[in-house]
Amino acid sequence: MADTEQPPTAPTAPEPTTATPTAPIAPVAIFKKRGAKGKANLRKRPASPPPAAKDSDDDSSDFESSEDEATGQRIKRRKKNHHSAAVMASSRDHNASTNSGVTKEEQIRSNTIYEADRDAALRLDATKQDATKGSNWFDEDNEKEDLSVGNLLGRTRTMMKTKKKVGGEDDAVQNSEREPDGTYRGLANQASYIQKNPNAPNRKVGPIKAPSNIRTITITDMAPDVCKDYKQTGFCGFGDNCKFLHAREDYAHGWQLDKEWENVTKGKKNLQGTVVASADRRNKPKNTAEEEEDADAAEEALLENIPFACIICRGPYSNSPVVTRCGHYFCEACALKRYRKDPSCAACGSGTNGVFNAAKRLAKLLEKKKARAERLRREARERGEEVSEEEDEGEDEGEGAEGSD
C-alpha cells in the first residue's frame, strides 16, 4: 500500500475572548538616580553628640535611629549596653531640658538607669556554681593544672613524690612513690595508690610479733571422715565415687592417742632406746607368729569384698546367711522380707528371681574372723592397750547371736 499525502492546512487565527483577567498585573519598579539639583533641596541631619569617655572603647555602630512622631525630627539614640555603667539620656530630652531651663542634675535623676559595675572581679560565678564548690573539685580555668594529680585525685589524697637525679632525669623510685606518666612498666612495677598505715611495721616477710594481750592456742585433732555404711556393713552403694574414707579399722581421736601415750610412758618424757632389729639373722629362730599373720592376711583378703554385717538390718548375720546370684550376702529373714516388696537385690538392684542359696563358706570365714579378732583383743589387753567399745559390743552381739542359734 502506498501512503497518501495530505495537503498542509493553514493556521487558524485565535478567536477573540471577552473575559477580563482575574489577577491584577504587578507594577514595575523604576529606579531613578537623583541628580545634583534634587540633593540640594534635602534637609541635613543634625550631628550626633560624641560618645562618653567610658564608652570610647565600644563600637561606634551601636546606635539606633528613631523618628519622632510629633515633630518628625530624626534623633539618634545610643543602644543600651549592659557592660557600661554610664548614665544614658536621649538627645531630644537633652535639647528639651536646655530649652526649658532644667538643670543637669535633675535630668540625670529623672533619666538615670542604674547598672552593675562589671569592671570589678566577680566573687561568684553562676555557671560554675562556686557557692557549693568543694576543695577537691576539678577546675578548668587553670590550664596548667588541668591534668595534675591534685585535680584528678582530689585534695584529700597526698601528692606522690618522685626522686630526681642531678641532671634532672627521673630516678628509679619505688612503686608507691612513682608518679604515673603513661609508661607501662610491667605488673610488678605498677604504681600503688593505697595509702600505707604509718604505724604498721615495715617488715613484709618473716615472723611478726604476736600481740601481748591475746593468747592463741592451736590444737590439731584427728577426725577423719569415714564412710559410716562401709564401716558398719562393709558395703557402700557409691563405690569408688564416695567422698568418705572406706576404712573398717578402728581409729582413735587426738585426745585418745595422747591419753594412750601417757598410759604407756607413765608420764616419762625421756624413754630409753630399744633395739628394733638385729643384723645377725643366722641364729634367729623361726617366728611362727609371722607365718600366722601371713595366713590371717590371706583370709582378710578374701573377706575384703564381703561385708561382715547384713546391709539390710545392719547387724550381724542371724540364722544362716544366704547369697544371691549376683554374689551379695544377706540374712535369710531380711532377704525374704525384702523379696515380698521388692524382688531386686538390695546391694546392686539386679533381679534375684527368688533364688537365695545358703552361704556355707561365709559362715566358716566369719567364725575364723571372730576367733582371730578375739585373739587380737586379748593380746592387746595383755599389753595394756585399751580396746574400743565398739569391738566389745560387736563381740557380745556375736556371742548372743550364736547362743540364739
Curated annotation (Swiss-Prot):
CDD domains: RING-HC_RNF113A_B. Its main location: nucleus. Residues 15-29 have a biased composition (Low complexity). InterPro entries: CWC24-like, Znf_CCCH, Znf_CCCH_sf, Znf_RING, Znf_RING/FYVE/PHD, Znf_RING_CS. Residues 56-70, 387-405 have a biased composition (Acidic residues). A zinc finger (C3H1-type) spans 221-249. Residues 1-114, 162-184, 370-405 are annotated as: Disordered. It holds the Pfam family zf-CCCH. A zinc finger (RING-type) spans 310-349. PROSITE patterns: ZF_C3H1, ZF_RING_1, ZF_RING_2. It is found in: Nucleus. Keywords: DNA-binding, Metal-binding, mRNA processing, mRNA splicing, Nucleus, Spliceosome, Zinc, Zinc-finger. The keyword Nucleus applies. GO terms for molecular function: DNA binding; zinc ion binding. Residues 370-386 have a biased composition (Basic and acidic residues). One of its GO terms (biological process) is snoRNA splicing. One of its GO terms (cellular component) is U2-type spliceosomal complex. SMART domains: RING, ZnF_C3H1. Gene3D superfamilies: Zinc finger, CCCH-type, Zinc/RING finger domain, C3HC4 (zinc finger). Residues 31-46, 74-83 have a biased composition (Basic residues). Associated with the spliceosome. Involved in pre-mRNA splicing. This is Pre-mRNA-splicing factor cwc-24. The gene is cwc-24.
